[in-house]
Swiss-Prot record:
GO terms of biological process kind: symbiont-mediated suppression of host cytoplasmic pattern recognition receptor signaling pathway via inhibition of IRF7 activity; symbiont-mediated suppression of host cytoplasmic pattern recognition receptor signaling pathway via inhibition of TBK1 activity; symbiont-mediated suppression of host toll-like receptor signaling pathway; taxis
Keyword Repressor: no
Protein name per the record: Protein MGF 360-11L
UniProt subunit comment: Interacts with host TBK1 ad IRF7.
InterPro entries: ASFV_MGF360
Family of the protein in this entry: Belongs to the asfivirus MGF 360 family.
Source domain of life: Viruses
Pfam family, one: ASFV_360
Protein keywords: Host-virus interaction, Inhibition of host innate immune response by virus, Inhibition of host IRF7 by virus, Inhibition of host RLR pathway by virus, Inhibition of host TBK1 by virus, Inhibition of host TLR pathway by virus, Viral immunoevasion
Organism in which the protein naturally occurs: African swine fever virus (isolate Tick/South Africa/Pretoriuskop Pr4/1996) (ASFV)
Functional summary from the UniProt entry: Plays a role in virus cell tropism, and may be required for efficient virus replication in macrophages. In addition, inhibits the phosphorylation of host TBK1 and IRF7 and thereby negatively regulates the host cGAS signaling pathway and antagonizes IFN-mediated antiviral activity.
Length: 353
């Protein structure tokens, strides 16, 4: 829809750096939301708005969705005139009056399945705490999503989290669709270390504490891992934890943490071979793993002759500097952030001869 002169003026005003002394002007102009000013800025050719309810900033379409969810008709009109796609609002429109307004502003009566999936994944694109919490609030238990087959969206989520799903078996068809979505948002929060979002899910869903622990292991988030295991006392079998840590390659911090906590490093070595993870394999050797014959047999069985050849060498030794007990995540991160395996270097030198 074509913007009015009034909405264009408001758009220019929202893009200015306005001092606190002049906030009353913004309030008089309707640029006020949740007891704070609405600010606007452009990032990578996309319009973002910021207010007290979204201190980190959100994309304009997502701001529209929140305004629709709150039945805030003035902001629905304003954001639409600023360029928001009113069809995004239809996802959140739960009252007849608001749905009618969205249609008046150009929304389709019926959104195709593919378009709803597009809206879903476009909305999750910005990995901030504000946005992930909002996605959870908008999409979980949303009757408008019944338009699509939940199996479609479930399948997309399962694909995005496929590595995690293969080892945890916690996101299966016995879960309600709402639970699947919650686990999805929670996993994103842990993967991107979104502390406010992590805190939100942790307090709201005590039954998913183990899920958070699994995500911390899988995504190599040693800070979250330490907080859960040592401070919050969330527990799993330590070898099971190590198994999850070894599934993604170069997960040095999570592997080291589990090793220090008593996990079997030879079992970790075998899991790394099972998953074709050369980086993890040599890191386990650096930590003292020595299941060479068993590992070689496993590699040959899986047809991975590069790893089998690597395990045939007799020149590997534990790295003494790694064997000191360090549990502070800051120190672990500093120690391993740019770590290069000494034993992998030995193997690569041998290969180049």
């Amino acid at each position: 829809m074509l913007p009015s002169l009034q909405s264009l003026t408001k758009k220019v005003l929202a893009g200015q750096c306005v001092s606190v002394d002049h906030y009353h002007i913004l309030k008089c102009c309707g640029l006020w939301w949740h007891n704070g000013p609405i600010m606007l800025h452009i990032r990578r050719n996309r319009i973002f708005i910021r207010s007290t309810c979204f201190s980190q900033g959100i994309e304009l379409n997502i701001g529209l969705m929140k305004a629709v969810k709150e039945n805030n008709h003035d902001l629905i009109k304003l954001f639409t005139e600023w360029g928001a796609d009113i069809n995004y609002g239809m996802i959140c429109a739960l009252t007849e009056n608001t749905r009618d307004l969205c249609k008046e502003l150009g929304a389709k009566e019926y959104l195709e399945r593919e378009y709803i999936l597009k809206i879903f994944f476009d909305t999750t694109r910005d990995k901030t705490s504000n946005n992930i919490i909002f996605c959870h609030e908008v999409f979980s238990n949303n009757p408008n999503l019944r338009i699509i087959d939940n199996l479609d969206l479930r399948g997309e989520i399962m694909w995005e989290l496929r590595g995690l799903m293969e080892i945890t078996f916690m996101l299966d068809h016995d879960d309600s669709f709402s639970t699947v979505l919650t686990k999805y948002w929670y996993a994103i929060a842990v993967d991107y270390d979104l502390k406010d979002a992590i805190r939100y899910f942790y307090q709201k869903y005590p039954r998913l504490h183990r899920w958070r622990l699994m995500c911390a292991l899988f995504y190599n988030n040693v800070f979250d891992l330490h907080e859960l295991y040592e401070i919050e006392r969330v527990r799993m079998d330590i070898d099971e934890m190590m198994h999850i840590a070894c599934v993604q390659d170069y997960s040095y911090s999570a592997i080291y943490y589990c090793f220090i906590m008593g996990a079997n490093i030879n079992q970790a070595m075998l899991v790394s071979i099972q998953n074709y993870n050369l980086g993890n394999l040599f890191f386990c050797i650096d930590l003292g793993a020595n299941a060479f014959e068993e590992g070689k047999a496993l590699a040959e069985q899986k047809g991975n002759y590069l790893i089998a050849n690597a395990l045939s060498l007799k020149h590997y030794n534990p790295v003494i500097s790694l064997l000191s007990v360090v549990t502070d995540p800051e120190k672990i991160n500093r120690m391993l952030k740019n770590y290069h395996s000494i034993n992998m270097g030995i193997f690569l030198d041998y290969e180049q001869r």
